[in-house]
Every structure is written in C-alpha cells, then in structure tokens.
Amino acid sequence: MNTYRTGLFSEFLARMYLRCHGFRIVKSRYITGRNTGRAEIDIIAKRRNLLIFVEVKHRPTLSDGWDAITARQSVRLRNAAENYIAKNAWRGDARFDVIVVCGWRIHWARGAI
C-alpha cells in the first residue's frame, strides 16, 4: 500500500474511532483557499457543543507522529479552523486534536495543537 492510501486508511480508522466515542463527522479533508495559506484539516467532528479539528498522522512509532506536526503546520491548521468557524458561524467550543495511527493502534491527543 502506498503512502497516500495508507493516509486515507488512517483517516478512515480515525473517523470510525471518533464515531465510537460519540462524535458526528461534519467534514473530512476540509481544504481552504489561497487567503489562508492553503491548508487541509483531515477531520472536523462535532459532539454536542464541541467542534474538534483533527490532524491524522500514520507513523511507525508514536514519537514520529508527534514530530510530524511542525509549527508552520499548526499555524496553517489554526487559520483553516478560523476560516471554517467564520464561514459556518460556529458559536460553541472548539479544540484541536491529533490522532496518530501506529499499525492498528490509535493514539488520540485531545487539545494537542
């Protein structure tokens, strides 16, 4: 399996994992335009009054997953999230999470970015 397909499969696993934890998937692979530095949010999910923006990483080890998120990427994700919140007039709470998939293990860090 190539890296693109592995990434798609990891995102699928992350969506199923979030659903099992009571979240409804609002959007997958949300891409912003030029004005926000072109960023992609892997998953946007909602539970009650909480909206989460999730970055999914597939890595052989957990530490590789955390290291894969750079400061520049964090800024882009925040800008993309602000774009989504403004566009959809979201009034509830919001949070940035990271899900790292290592083989078949899923590690979910809440409020990680």
PLM region spans:
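Active-site metal-binding core of divalent-cation-utilizing nuclease and nuclease-like domains
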Residues: R24-L51
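Solvent-exposed beta-strand sheet faces enriched in polar/charged residues
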Residues: R29, K57, D97-I99
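Short, conserved glycine- and acidic-residue-centered signature motifs
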Residues: G7, E11, G37, I69-Q73
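Acidic-basic catalytic patches of nuclease active cores, encompassing PD-(D/E)XK
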Residues: M1-Y30
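Conserved catalytic cores of phosphodiester-cleaving nucleases, focusing on short active-site segments
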Residues: I41-S63, L77
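Mg2+/Mn2+-dependent nuclease catalytic core
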Residues: R59-N83
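Domain-level recognition of nuclease-like catalytic cores that cleave nucleotide substrates
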Residues: K87-I113
